[in-house]
From Swiss-Prot:
Membrane-spanning segments: 9-29
Family, similarity comment: Belongs to the cytochrome P450 family.
Location of this chain's protein in the cell: Membrane
Binding site for heme: 444
Glycan-linked positions: 124, 190, 271, 342
Membrane topology: Single-pass membrane protein
Source lineage: Eukaryota, Fungi, Dikarya, Ascomycota, Pezizomycotina
Species this protein is from: Clonostachys rogersoniana
Class of the enzyme per the UniProt entry, highest EC level: oxidoreductase
Name listed for the protein in its UniProt record: Cytochrome P450 monooxygenase verC
SUPFAM superfamilies per record: Cytochrome P450 (SSF48264)
Length: 502
C-alpha cells in the first residue's frame, strides 16, 4: 500500500498537488481570491464574449468541490436558481474543472452537432473515485477508444436485436412481480425501493442469460456497496483529489473490495454461460481475449450498464408508475390499449416494441417531465466553439435538462402531463428540445432496449392492477430521497387487483 501510494503521488499532475493550497485561502473566506487561484492552478482559458471580450458569467470556486456536489444532490433547484442569476449560458466549477452550462435548444444544437468527435471527462469531473469505477467504460471514453470499446457491445443493443428481447424481458418482469406480490393482493409499494431491481435484472439477462437464484442474490448483495461508492464519488471531498485517496475515511478499501467481487462474479458467469450457451458475456469475453478491449474496459462497461444505471432505471420506472397512477384517465386509456393488443403473446410482444402507441407516448412524456439528471455529463469539443456569442475554448460543457425539457417554448403548457403531444411527432422535432439519451450522433448504448423495458413493466402492472398514487398533494407531494445522487422519488402507490370484468 505504501509503495502504491508513493508511486501515485509522484505521478500526480501539479494541478492535484497545488489544489491543496486552496484549503488555506478557502478558510479565509476570500471567494474571489480562491476562484483566481483555481484559474491559475488549472491553466484553463475562460470562455469570453465575442463582443466585449468579457468573461462568461458564473459561480465562484468553493473548495473542495466547487458546485460539483450540488449539481447532483441539489441540482434541480440549483439549476433554476443559477439560470435566473446568470442567464442562459454560464459556468460552474466541478472540483477544479470549469463547466459551461447551456440552457437553450439553439445553444445545444450549436455545440452538439458533432458530438461523436467530443472528448468525455474520464472522471466525469468528479475525481479519482469515479475514474477508478468507470473511467474505462464505453460511456466515458472518447473518439477512437470509444469506437473500439463500443464495437463488441453494439450487436446486443442494436435495434434489430432489441426487437427480439421482449419475450425474455416479459418473463423477467412476471417473475419479479410474482415474488413481489405472490398472492396478487392489494399492496402498497415505494416505487423506487420496491421496483428498482426489476429493470436491473432485465438488463442483466442480456449479458448473463437466465439467472440462477444464487446469481440474483449475489447481484443484489453487490448493489448496496456499489451505490455507496457512487454516493462517495459525487459527494467529493477526499474522494475527489487523488492525493487524499489513502487518507482515513476515503472509499479506497470499499472500492477494492467491490472490484474484486465484481470481477469474480463476471468470470463465474462467463464460465456458466459457456456451458448453457445463454447470454452475451461469452462473445464479450472473446473480444477481450482477441485484444479488442481490455478486461478493465469490459468490467467497467458491464458495471455502467448495470450498477451505474441501477438508480437511473429506478428513477425512470418510478416516475412512470407515479405518473400513470396519478393520471387515472390516461391509465384507463392505456389499459384498454394494452388489452386490445394482448390477444396473443406475439401480438403483445410486437405492441411493446411500437413507438406509435399511447403507452409509448406516456413513457416519453414522463421522461420529458422528469429527466434523470439535472445536468448532462460533461464533454468538450476538440476545437473552440462559438455558442451564444461566447467563445468556448475546448472547455467541458453540460446541459441544464430542466431548461430544455420543460422551460422551453417548444413545449406548449410544458408543466402538464400530456402524452398525446408526442403522438404523430417525429423524432427530429425533439432532437434538441428534449434531453434523454444524449444529443447529437453519440447517444446512450442502451436506448433501444430502455423504452421496451419501461413499457413492459407498465404493461405487466396495468394488466393486473389498478394503480393509485397515495399522495394528498398529488405529484407535487412526492418527495425525493435526500441521500440519492439522482433524486429518486419516494412515491407511494397502491396496487389494487383488477376485477375479472375490468
Amino acid at each position: 500500500m505504501l509503495s502504491e501510494m508513493l508511486g501515485e503521488i509522484a505521478a500526480l499532475p501539479m494541478v492535484s498537488l497545488l489544489g491543496a493550497a486552496l484549503i488555506v485561502v478557502s478558510v479565509l473566506g476570500r471567494r474571489l481570491l480562491v476562484s483566481n487561484i483555481a484559474w491559475a492552478i488549472t491553466g484553463q482559458t475562460p470562455a469570453k464574449s465575442l463582443a466585449k471580450r468579457s468573461r462568461l458569467p458564473g459561480l465562484p470556486f468553493k473548495f473542495p468541490n466547487g458546485q460539483g456536489t450540488e449539481k447532483f444532490f441539489g441540482g434541480r433547484s440549483a439549476a433554476r436558481r443559477w439560470r435566473i442569476q446568470y442567464g442562459p449560458i454560464y459556468a460552474i466549477w466541478a472540483g477544479l474543472k470549469r463547466e459551461v452550462v447551456l440552457s437553450t435548444p439553439e445553444h445545444v444544437q450549436a455545440f452538439y452537432k458533432d458530438s461523436h468527435l467530443h472528448v468525455k471527462a474520464t472522471d466525469n469531473n468528479s475525481g479519482w473515485l469515479f475514474a477508478e469505477l468507470l473511467g474505462s467504460c464505453v460511456g466515458v471514453v472518447s473518439q477512437g477508444r470509444w469506437k473500439r470499446v463500443r464495437r463488441p457491445f453494439e450487436h446486443p443493443f442494436s435495434r434489430p436485436e432489441s426487437l427480439t428481447r421482449p419475450k425474455a424481458f416479459i418473463h423477467e418482469a412476471r417473475d419479479y412481480f410474482a415474488v413481489l406480490n405472490p398472492n396478487i393482493q392489494e399492496l402498497t409499494i415505494n416505487t423506487s425501493n420496491d421496483l428498482k431491481h426489476c429493470p436491473f435484472f432485465m438488463v442483466a439477462s442480456i449479458f448473463f442469460g437466465i439467472h440462477t437464484t444464487a446469481q440474483r442474490d449475489e447481484l443484489k448483495q453487490l448493489g448496496p456497496p456499489r451505490e455507496e461508492l457512487f454516493r462517495h464519488a459525487f459527494m467529493g471531498g477526499m474522494n475527489r483529489y487523488a492525493i487524499t485517496k489513502y487518507l482515513p475515511g476515503s472509499a479506497l478499501a470499499l472500492l477494492r473490495q467491490f472490484q474484486g467481487k465484481w470481477e469474480g462474479f463476471v468470470k463465474a458467469a462467463y464460465n456458466r454461460s459457456i456451458q448453457t450457451g445463454d447470454g452475451t458475456i461469452v462473445p464479450l469475453f472473446e473480444a477481450v481475449n482477441r485484444g479488442e478491449m481490455s478486461m478493465q474496459e469490459l468490467l467497467q462497461t458491464l458495471d455502467e450498464s448495470l450498477f451505474a444505471n441501477l438508480d437511473v432505471t429506478a428513477h425512470a420506472v418510478s416516475w412512470n408508475v407515479i405518473r400513470i397512477a396519478h393520471h387515472q384517465d390516461i391509465q384507463q386509456k392505456v389499459r384498454i390499449e394494452i388489452q386490445a393488443n394482448n390477444n396473443s403473446e406475439k401480438s403483445y410482444e410486437n405492441y411493446v416494441c411500437r413507438d406509435d402507441t399511447l403507452l409509448a407516448a406516456c413513457v416519453l412524456e414522463t421522461s420529458r417531465l422528469h429527466p434523470v439528471l439535472p445536468f448532462s455529463n460533461p464533454e468538450a469539443a476538440e476545437e473552440d466553439k462559438i455558442v451564444g456569442g461566447y467563445i468556448i475554448p475546448q472547455t467541458d460543457v453540460i446541459v441544464d435538462t430542466h431548461a430544455i425539457n420543460i422551460d422551453n417554448p417548444h413545449w406548449v403548457d410544458s408543466n402538464s402531463f400530456d402524452p398525446h403531444r408526442h403522438l404523430g411527432q417525429k423524432d427530429s422535432s425533439r432532437r434538441y428540445n428534449m434531453w434523454r439519451f444524449g444529443f447529437g450522433p453519440r447517444q446512450c448504448l442502451g436506448k433501444n432496449v430502455a423504452d421496451i423495458i419501461l413499457r413492459i413493466i407498465l404493461c405487466e402492472m396495468l394488466n393486473t392492477y389498478e394503480l393509485g398514487l397515495l399522495e394528498e398533494e398529488g405529484i407535487t407531494g412526492v418527495k425525493l430521497q435526500p441521500d440519492s445522487w439522482i433524486g429518486l422519488p419516494n412515491g407511494v402507490v397502491q396496487m389494487t387487483p383488477l376485477k375479472l370484468d375490468e
